[in-house]
């Protein structure tokens, strides 16, 4: 293993976060997810390869959500009435694994899966949500606020618009955030 002797790891050039880096992340993740979806569809049997492909799609979705949503607008939605300085946690309103499965079975496009609803919840409400059966599932994907309604959680959009969770559905989400969804 002499070939590793004298190796000096080069630090990557820092990338300035902003529009160009968010767009690059979106395009990279979209291309890779499309590639993995095609690989998945070519499989003849649900085996370890299928599991690894699903895992890779999960990683790419979460990477995009963390970088291009969480680091950009914080989340699509915010729990209403949080006092300034309240510790919040980033939450997938529709669990990421559900979005992945919807994508694999042609119920969502890649752009839609990349932009599933996300929310900043207080740590207290997030723990409460996770302590129920609703932590990693949802009773209704289209009416995705049902799991929040059961806990009395109200929300606004990231730019302060009040959301009526009884009428705001997945179509409302994608219509409101259409400028966040790129279709390159």
Language model features with spans:
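A structural signal for short, well-ordered beta-strand segments and their strand-loop junctions
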Residues: 89, 119-123, 157
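Amphipathic alpha-helical interaction surfaces
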Residues: 66, 96-100, 124-128
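Residues that flank catalytic or metal-binding motifs in active/ligand-binding sites
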Residues: 86-89, 117-118, 144
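Short Cys/His-centered divalent metal-binding micro-motifs
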Residues: 112-139
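Nuclease and nuclease-like effector domains acting on nucleic acids or nucleotide cofactors
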Residues: 1-85, 131-184
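Histidine-centered nuclease catalytic patch
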Residues: 82-113
């Amino acid at each position: 293993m002499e070939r590793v002797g004298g190796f000096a790891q080069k630090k990557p050039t820092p990338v300035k976060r902003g529009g160009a880096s968010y767009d690059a992340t979106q395009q990279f993740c979209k291309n890779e997810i499309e590639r993995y979806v095609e690989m998945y569809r070519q499989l003849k049997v649900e085996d370890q390869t299928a599991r690894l492909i699903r895992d890779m799609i999960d990683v790419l979705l979460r990477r995009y959500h963390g970088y291009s949503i969480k680091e950009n607008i914080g989340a699509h939605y915010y729990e209403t009435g949080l006092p300034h300085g309240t510790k919040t946690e980033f939450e997938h309103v529709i669990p990421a694994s559900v979005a992945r499965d919807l994508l694999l079975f042609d119920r969502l496009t890649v752009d839609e899966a990349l932009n599933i609803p996300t929310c900043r919840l207080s740590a207290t409400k997030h723990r409460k949500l996770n302590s129920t059966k609703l932590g990693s599932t949802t009773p209704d994907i289209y009416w995705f606020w049902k799991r929040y309604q059961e806990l009395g959680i109200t929300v606004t959009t990231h730019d302060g618009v009040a959301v009526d969770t009884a009428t705001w559905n997945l179509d409302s989400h994608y219509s409101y955030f259409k400028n966040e969804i790129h279709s390159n």
